[in-house]
Amino acid sequence: MRRLVLLLTISVLLYQDLPVRSEFEWDRICGYGTARCRNKCRSQEYRIGRCPNTFACCLRKWDESLLNSTKP
């Protein structure tokens, strides 16, 4: 009887899709290490592609004045 309960418990645990798996896929690094996988990009981010888990690969927007910084 104990074995039956143990086997039933193990099979129920293995059948469930554990939420830990989705936490690993959430906020994963993409874009050669410069972006993050998100369900939806934030307002200060650009969507640069798709992650393997079908989330958007979001890159943070940059300040253009920093890119053209030339000292006079």
UniProtKB/Swiss-Prot annotation:
One of its GO terms (cellular component) is extracellular region. GO terms for biological process: defense response to bacterium; innate immune response. Residues 1-22 form the signal peptide. Disulfide bonds join C30-C57, C37-C51, C41-C58. It is found in: Secreted. Transmembrane segments: none annotated. This is Beta-defensin 104A.
